[in-house]
Amino acid sequence: MTKFFEKRLTDVIKRPLITEKATKALDLNQYTFEVDPRAAKPDIKAAVEKMFDVKVLGISTMNPPRKSRRVGRFSGKRPQVKKAVVRLAEGNSIQLFPESEEA
C-alpha cells in the first residue's frame, strides 16, 4: 500500500461503474469501479477488502484517454479517470443493487 492512501482507504474507490460490459462481468464475480487515478493496485485491493469485507483474487486497472469537450468556443478536457476490475474469490459477492421490497 502506498503512503498516500495509507490512512484514507475510503477515498480510493469513487463509485461502481454500471455498464453493459460490467454487468456481464458480474456473472464471473468481477466488479468494475472508478478509482482515484493516483491509486495503485495494493491500495485498491486494501480498500475493497476493508469496505466490502471480501477476498480479492486479482485486479486489472485501465487509464482510458481523456476526451475533449467544447462549450461554445472554449475547449477543455474531461477529468482523468481510472477504472479497476476487481475479481473476487468464489463465494464472495458485493451487493451493488439494493433488494427491492414489494409492498
Swiss-Prot record:
Keywords: Ribonucleoprotein, Ribosomal protein, RNA-binding, rRNA-binding. The keyword rRNA-binding applies. One of its GO terms (biological process) is translation. GO terms for cellular component: ribonucleoprotein complex; ribosome. Pfam families: Ribosomal_L23. One of its GO terms (molecular function) is rRNA binding. One of the early assembly proteins it binds 23S rRNA. One of the proteins that surrounds the polypeptide exit tunnel on the outside of the ribosome. Forms the main docking site for trigger factor binding to the ribosome. Belongs to the universal ribosomal protein uL23 family. This is Large ribosomal subunit protein uL23. The lineage of its organism: Bacteria, Bacillati, Cyanobacteriota, Cyanophyceae, Synechococcales. The gene is rplW.
